[in-house]
Amino acid sequence: MSIIFRSDDVLIYSMAEVRRTSNLFWAVFTLLGSLGLLFVAISSYLGMDLFFISEKISDFSFIPDFIYFPFIPQGATMAFYGIAGLFSSFYFGSIIFWDIGGGFDIFNKKGKKVRFVRWGFPGKNRRIILEIPMNELHSIRIITEVKEEGIFTRTSTFESIVYLETIEQGFIPLTRIEDNLNGTQIAHKAGELSVFLGVPLFY
């Protein structure tokens, strides 16, 4: 998340939910992998040999010149996983293209409202908006949870999230674990919002 606009009365954060390099990588990786599986499955169904070894190294006796997969069961299995991977890659691509879950956090002191805008799938609920009057804001809170990981060696990790505490809506998260913010960045964001909104900061 990052600030895209700031003035004395308005503060706007951009929320990049799915448009991340890692998500784009996995979408492309899944697409290429599924196409590869479908190619092998089609070749198996048509009875084609899969030539993939260069002639320079094909003289070694332990390296086959080609690989043949019978369509039942290997080819059919690869076709199933290839089709499933293709649908998954299209799904990942669509949520990246439509920026599902992304949006803006708008803090408007002049309008005396806090507005959370999130993007959904195309249709009636494409734009999801939550508005909270500023007189319902109670505080900004940093809540830290301790999680233990590992089976044989137990290691503790501390995860902090900034929340907006309201009277009617309760606690609304303003950051996420996936944002990978360090302690300094968490404290800076919480302090920045506390000063801008004129509400106390608790941790």
Curated annotation (Swiss-Prot):
It is a multi-pass membrane protein. InterPro entries: PSI_Ycf4_assembly (IPR003359). The chain crosses the membrane at residues 24-46, 76-98. Keywords: Chloroplast, Membrane, Photosynthesis, Plastid, Thylakoid, Transmembrane, Transmembrane helix. Its main location: plastid. GO terms for biological process: photosynthesis. It is found in: Plastid, Chloroplast thylakoid membrane. GO terms for cellular component: chloroplast thylakoid membrane; photosystem I. Seems to be required for the assembly of the photosystem I complex. Belongs to the Ycf4 family. This is Photosystem I assembly protein Ycf4. It comes from Glycine max (Soybean).
